[in-house]
């Protein structure tokens, strides 16, 4: 490594500290104090310094993404078991729990409890040593889980280093739940529908599927959150209670539950549970209950555990909000990529205080699998109080007049013949000029994550399109105030504001524009990848798929759709027209050609004890473009051998795999 000037070293350390603080403000507190542009400039400066000087701190935000895909997850043993919770389904069962706790403690005094929302996600353990995150693992069977460290590092709400507390423990295992907010869950499912992929049944499955990806870049493309609420193994610090531990987590910049109440006695617990039930309607995440814990850690130890559950905690489950209603019709809805989705039209029914009259059915296979017919009485559930879905049919109420639903052979809007690719669930209209697709493409182009045209909502797009004022997203930039003034909802001021918002959107970034163009298979993450690898939009004109697949995380299918889009003259003509109307595109995400990767394409296996921790050596290999596998095979390029090697050495010799000493390995990195 080069000799680093002290001022450069200090600048890198300052940037890391400041960027981590701003991540905390943005992802944990949801209260940023700098703009996205300022953050991006700081991050870019940090990347430049790290690449030039090779000085990379383990908690640098640049280390959150970049690990190579794994063949499988390694096993990870929990030093303290990660137990599941017993459930209470009624207030009486809660009172029984309280009586049991008092009996086991041999006391009639009121017990102090904590009450918090029950997050519906994937239970995860974060392991820190001397304040640094070195391992993250799933619950698994409670004793052994899977090592998901690289994936967890992509979640920006999770600190890579513990800061802000008076005392940092030598070692600590922090437990919590990784989850998805409802809007991100819906975005992922919408994207999967457009790609013809099966949808996730609920946010919990989506969160679990996102975390348990062998390729960390897929995890990084989804906005995951974590709520930290539990403690496992700890050394070098002592906590007396759950409340004290939660306060320590807050100071340490960890995301904690949205609500934590200290309750004296079971009656206060019941009041807190009722309060959470009211509050959960406004939560951005799904919660199906509340968790009650004995506050004192000393009393927790006295109460102990059963085989699988602690005696000092219980999860109260809110009653499921369901209703039975008649299915009036199943409509075929056409999306911007031509995917035709079934939508259930229901007799209005009140579920959990909300009137439900529609429900998505995701895809036509689901309609067939559940044998859903028009005229059926169906069971509708509001999962997590937000997303209504049909969970089944009341078949004993059938009269024989119900109508089976057929997969549409023609587009319900333009009449074109539909297509279904082999192996895909999506049924598509392939007429690019289908009015429904055009309208949805304009909505997408104007949306918040794309061109972000304020005030141009779905209803306004529908109005302008139906009146023939706009026929393509390019037409948005041709709009004049007189075109919209006088239309329903548009007076002098509102029409002026919309024209100003459209003009403001002309200045954008390349990644936003790429996403706005609505290229099939290209979501926000793929748009950012393209922006990192291409300086300007014109560099993508007439691009070939062979060049695109050289970008890590861009697969053949995505590369092909990008090639098709940028080799279509009509699309290029539309982009050029946008530019003529004043579109200004910046690209702060473009990364200059990086230094060569000396280990690119090579697979390593490690055995024995090395001068540096194995995780650190693994990161060195991955940063240099290599890949680390857990077992020796004919596909292994090198076995890195430390002191006291195990059986892997004999296997490598038998397979004639090259062996390397640590010194030889370092020379390869030069």
From Swiss-Prot:
Reactions this protein catalyses: NAD(+) + (deoxyribonucleotide)n-3'-hydroxyl + 5'-phospho-(deoxyribonucleotide)m = (deoxyribonucleotide)n+m + AMP + beta-nicotinamide D-nucleotide
Alphabetized InterPro entries for the sequence: BRCT_dom, BRCT_dom_sf, DisA/LigA_HHH, DNA_ligase, DNA_ligase_CS, DNAligase_adenylation, DNAligase_N, Hlx-hairpin-Hlx_DNA-bd_motif
Active site (UniProt): 118 (n6-amp-lysine intermediate)
Top-rank taxon, per record: Bacteria
Reported cofactor(s): Mg(2+); Mn(2+)
CC annotations in GO: cytosol
Binding, NAD(+): 36-40, 84-85, 116, 139, 177, 293, 317
Molecular function terms, GO-annotated: DNA binding; DNA ligase (NAD+) activity; metal ion binding
GO annotation (BP), single: DNA replication
Keyword annotations: DNA damage, DNA repair, DNA replication, Ligase, Magnesium, Manganese, Metal-binding, NAD, Zinc
Pfam families xref list: BRCT, DNA_ligase_aden, DNA_ligase_OB, DNA_ligase_ZBD, HHH_2, Nlig-Ia
Keyword Signal: no
EC number: 6.5.1.2
Coiled-coil stretches noted in the UniProt entry, renumbered to this chain: none
Residues engaged in binding Zn(2+): 411, 414, 429, 434
PROSITE patterns, sorted: BRCT, DNA_LIGASE_N2
Domain named BRCT: residues: 594-670
PANTHER family, per database record: CHROMOSOME TRANSMISSION FIDELITY FACTOR 18 (PTHR23389), DNA LIGASE (PTHR23389:SF9)
Function of the molecule: DNA ligase that catalyzes the formation of phosphodiester linkages between 5'-phosphoryl and 3'-hydroxyl groups in double-stranded DNA using NAD as a coenzyme and as the energy source for the reaction. It is essential for DNA replication and repair of damaged DNA.
Family that this chain belongs to: Belongs to the NAD-dependent DNA ligase family. LigA subfamily.
Name of this chain's protein: DNA ligase
Species of the source: Thermodesulfovibrio yellowstonii (strain ATCC 51303 / DSM 11347 / YP87)
Gene: ligA
């Amino acid at each position: 490594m080069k000799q680093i000037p002290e001022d450069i070293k200090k600048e890198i350390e300052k940037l890391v500290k400041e960027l981590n603080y701003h991540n905390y403000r943005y992802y944990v507190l949801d209260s940023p104090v700098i703009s996205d542009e300022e953050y991006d400039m700081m991050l870019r400066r940090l990347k430049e310094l790290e690449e030039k000087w090779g000085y990379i701190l383990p908690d640098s935000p640049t280390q959150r993404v970049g690990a190579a895909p794994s063949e499988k997850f390694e096993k990870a043993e929990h030093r303290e078991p990660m137990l599941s919770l017993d459930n209470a389904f009624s207030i009486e069962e809660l009172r029984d729990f309280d009586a049991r706790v008092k009996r086991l403690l041999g006391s009639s005094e009121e017990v102090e409890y904590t009450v918090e929302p029950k997050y519906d996600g994937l239970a995860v353990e974060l392991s820190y040593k001397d304040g640094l995150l070195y391992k993250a693992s799933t619950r698994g069977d409670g004793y052994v889980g899977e090592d998901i460290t690289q994936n967890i590092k992509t979640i920006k709400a999770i600190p890579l280093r513990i800061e802000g507390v008076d005392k940092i423990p030598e070692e600590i295992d922090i437990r919590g739940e990784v989850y998805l907010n409802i809007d991100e869950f819906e975005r992922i499912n919408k994207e999967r529908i457009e790609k013809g992929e099966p949808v996730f049944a609920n946010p919990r499955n989506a969160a679990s599927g996102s975390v348990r990806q062998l390729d960390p870049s897929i995890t990084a493309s989804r906005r995951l959150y974590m709520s930290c609420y539990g403690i496992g193994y700890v050394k070098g610090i002592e906590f007396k209670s759950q409340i004290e531990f939660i306060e320590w987590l807050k100071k340490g910049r960890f995301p904690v539950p949205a609500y934590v109440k200290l309750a004296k006695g079971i009656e206060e617990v019941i009041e807190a549970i009722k309060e959470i039930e009211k509050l959960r309607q406004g939560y951005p995440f799904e919660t199906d209950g509340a968790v009650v814990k004995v506050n004192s850690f000393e009393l927790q130890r006295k109460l102990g555990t059963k085989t699988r559950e602690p005696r000092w905690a219980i999860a109260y489950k809110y009653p499921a909000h369901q209703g039975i209603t008649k299915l009036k019709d199943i409509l075929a809805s056409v999306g911007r990529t031509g995917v035709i989705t079934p939508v259930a039209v229901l007799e209005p029914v009140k579920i959990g205080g909300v009137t439900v009259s529609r429900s998505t059915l995701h895809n036509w296979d689901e309609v067939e699998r559940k044998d859903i017919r028009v005229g059926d009485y169906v069971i509708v559930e509001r999962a997590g109080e937000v997303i209504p879905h049909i969970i089944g049919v009341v078949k004993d109420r059938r009269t024989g007049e119900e109508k089976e639903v057929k997969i549409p052979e023609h587009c319900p809007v333009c009449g074109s013949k539909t297509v279904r690719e082999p192996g895909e669930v999506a049924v598509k209209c392939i007429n690019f000029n289908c009015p429904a697709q055009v309208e949805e493409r304009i909505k997408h182009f104007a949306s918040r994550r794309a061109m972000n045209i304020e005030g141009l909502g779905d209803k306004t797009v529908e109005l302008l399109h139906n009146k023939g004022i706009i026929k393509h997203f390019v037409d948005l930039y041709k709009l004049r105030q007189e075109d919209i003034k006088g239309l329903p909802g548009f007076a002098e001021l509102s029409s002026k504001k919309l024209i100003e918002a459209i003009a403001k959107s002309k200045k954008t970034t390349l990644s936003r524009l790429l996403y706005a163009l609505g290229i099939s298979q290209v979501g926000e993450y793929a748009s950012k990848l393209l922006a990192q690898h291409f300086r300007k939009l014109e560099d993508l004109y007439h691009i070939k798929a062979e060049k695109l697949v050289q970008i890590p995380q861009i697969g053949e299918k995505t590369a092909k759709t990008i090639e098709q889009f940028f080799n279509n003259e009509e699309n290029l003509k539309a982009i050029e027209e946008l530019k003529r109307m004043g579109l200004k595109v910046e690209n702060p995400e473009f990364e200059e050609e990086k230094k060569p990767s000396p280990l690119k394409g090579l697979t390593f296996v490690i055995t024995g004890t090395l001068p540096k921790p194995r995780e650190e050596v693994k990161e060195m290999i991955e940063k240099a473009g290599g890949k680390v596998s857990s077992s020796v095979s004919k596909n292994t390029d090198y076995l890195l051998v430390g002191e006291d090697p195990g059986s892997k050495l004999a296997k490598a010799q038998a397979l004639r795999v090259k062996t390397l000493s640590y010194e030889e390995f370092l020379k390869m990195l030069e």
